[in-house]
Each structure stands twice: as C-alpha cells, then as structure tokens.
Amino acid sequence: MGILISNDAAKVVIPVKLSLALPLAVIVFGFGYFVWLCIYNLYFHPLRRFPGPKLAAISRFPYSHLLISGKGHRDVLDLHLKYGPIVRIAPGFLSFSHPDAMNDIRGHRKAGQPEHRKDPIRQEVHIQNIIGANRADHTRFRRSLANGFSHQAMLDQEPIISEYVNELMKSLEEHSANGTQQIDMVRWFNYATFDIIGDLSFGESFGCLQSSTYDPWVQLIFNSVKNLVYIGALKHLQIVPRRLLKFILPYAMPKGLSTKHAENQRLSAMKVRKRLDTGSNRPDFMTSMTTKRNGESLTFEELTSNAAILIIAGSETTATALSAAAYYLGLFPEAQAKLAQEVRTTFNSAEDITITSVQHLTYMLAVLDEAMRMYPPAASGLPRLTAEGGATIAGEYVPQDTIVDVWQWPLFHNPNYWTQPDDFIPERWLGDPKFANDRRECFQPFSTGPRNCIGKK
C-alpha cells in the first residue's frame, strides 16, 4: 500500500511505513537518551559518590514532589537519618544536615573567594530587592536598611510598635471575652505584625487589628503561597526551558493571580509615593532607605521592591515564631507557668515592659529560641549553587555548580545533634547539663553570613 502524490511534473508513490519513520525515530532516540541519562547520573555524574535514593539520583521528580507534599521537612529528616549528613536528593542537588554546613554554604567567604550564588533554577535574576539582588546590589540595599534595624532605631520605633501591641492586647481581651472564648492566635499575631511592618515600611498600617480581618493585599500573600510552591517545583523539574516557562507561567497560574500581583505592585508603588510625599523623617524603614550614604541612593523602583519584601519577610515570619511559642506554651503548662512567674515577678505594670527591659527575661528568650527550633519560620532551605572551583562543605569536597542546601527543620530535629529533639524544653538554652551535648552552633533560624536576616536583632 502506498500514497500517490501527483502533480504536472511527476507522480511519486511514498510507502506508508516511511511516514512513520520520523516519529518512531524520535521515540527511540528519546528512550535511548533517557536510558543514557539514567546510567550517567548513577555511575558517571560528579555527585555519584554521595548517598541517597537511586530514583532521586536519576530524576528531579522525587524532589519536586517533596516540595509540594506538605511534609517535605519530615521526609528530608528521614533521608538524613537513613543516608547520613549529606544526601543526594536530585541529580545535581545535595542536602546537608550537619552543624558546619550552614556556615560553609552561607557564611562569609574569604577574601577573593567567589560567593555561592542563589539557585538559578528557582531564583529570578535582576531582582531589585535585598532578597534576590546580586552581591553588589545586596550590599548597597543592606547598607541603606541598616540604620532602620539598628538598636537605636528600635528604641526610636518603640512608641510606634507599642501602639500596635497595646491595640493587640485590647483586641484579644475583647474578642476572647476576657479569656473565656477561644480565638485564633495565628490570625491575631499576623494582624499585629502586618500592621507594624506596614507602618514602618509605608508610614501607615493595613488596619488589620482595627478591622479584625486581613487587608486584601495581606490576604493575597497567604493565598498565593501554595501557588508559588507549585511554581517552584515546576521550575525545579526543568522540563520546560526557562525562557519559555517565563512566558507560559502567567497562563498556568490560577485565574486572576497575575492580575492581582500586578495590582499589588501598583498599590505598593502608590504607598511608597504617598509616604515619600509626606517628607517625614519619622524613625521608620523608609527614612533609612531614603537617606543618602556616600552619595548612594535607591531608585523609586528599588524603594518599592524592598518595602514590599519587608512586608512579607518581616511580618509572617515573626507571627509564625510567636504562634509557635504560644502553641508550645499551651502544650507544656509547666513552661507556661515558669514564664508567667518570670514576667510577673520582674514587672510591676505593663508600662515597665519595654524593648530594653525584656532583654533580661532569660526564660522568655529561651522559650523563643526553643519555639524557633521546634517550628522554624523558614522550615525549608534557601538553595545555593557552589562557586567556581567547588567548595568544602561539612568536610567534603563538592564540585562547582552543585545545588546545595540546608533545611532548618530537619537540622533542628536531628537526634544526632539534639537531646530529645522533638520535645519543647526551654531549659536546653539555660545551661542544663542534660543538654550539654546539643550542637547549638547549628541553630541559625535567621541564617548566617552576609545575607542573614537583617531583622535578627
């Protein structure tokens, strides 16, 4: 049987079998390439000597699934308990659970040593804020923000912060009917932190405490978290070229998400413009960012982007830490009683509680540290790409261009480094000899190095 193609010049008969040759060749080539890639990743890849699941060594799918499973932090811990402190969790990706790893990956590099770059798979380039900027711009942004996060700045900002804390306490009394009704503390902590950071960033709050609900912008942040996780997992698969992915992502997002994102970018710019138009020198983040230093100043776009990132990075993380502390104090009444006694024997009235005076509450500080160990606000990691020439991480040489990471939750719950890691015990931070072997140096909830959290103080 054949296909007859005719024209004025000639008649050509093409066998049907030949018409199937091209797709068949593509299938055979694709299968052959997949088999070759599996063999290469298992036996010839530069990371072949590192332990881990065989499927993870040949495919990125297991790690992408781990990212969207909702229990990735526990899965990563299980992998480290099975394979050791270094696990190959994807073909070119190493996960570390070792006390030295975080400093080796994110710590200060020696003079002349290149910085480990942000993971290019999930990190966009040319971002105009302190989170995603390159080394030079990050230094410039951090310098512009430094005064806004200094100890003196916190003292100057205390009246602003205290106003919202007092409003929070008043709202809690009112909505809990003086402690007789249950309330959602996670929401109320978020109301307060978003109002505080909003005021310090834009000169006005979001009004969450007053309205007892989330501002639409704040609500969008929570609604989009899952979508961003799915997008990150899709990027990690690297099935679609990055340039093409950037084009199709807006169409793959839930309906209206791109529009809302653009709208909120517009609102952020509007809030920054409104704050700048006041000409105020109040002790907030915007005053710090707009103060010229050594002739340097930030563009309007940089001001807008950094102010917006402060809202996300400074609000939800703080609320998460406070929520964790409240949750575990509720689970462990003996710890709650000790903390209550410390506070009530230290202060005679609420007016005595200040940013300076609370620094002497040793048990309270231990409670906060233990809460962040048990439930770190950044439970997963911030991947890096090893610099040119490779690096020694946790005592092992890692080739250049390897994605490396430390997940905080698995590290903080690893029984190799912590006594009773799954128990909430603030005393471990107060010199109790029972916990003398805890590797407290690996407790870095604010990260470490030149890109550690500027709000650590």
Show the residue positions of the predicted features.
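Conserved cytochrome P450 catalytic core segment spanning the I/J/K helices
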Residues: 184, 256-321, 361
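Conserved cytochrome P450 K-helix/beta-meander segment immediately N-terminal to the heme-binding cysteine loop
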Residues: 387, 406-434
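Cytochrome P450 catalytic-domain helical core, especially the substrate-recognition surface
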Residues: 2, 56-69, 117-202, 216-273, ...
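Conserved cytochrome P450 K-helix E-x-x-R motif and the immediately C-terminal K′/meander segment
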Residues: 69-76, 238, 352-394
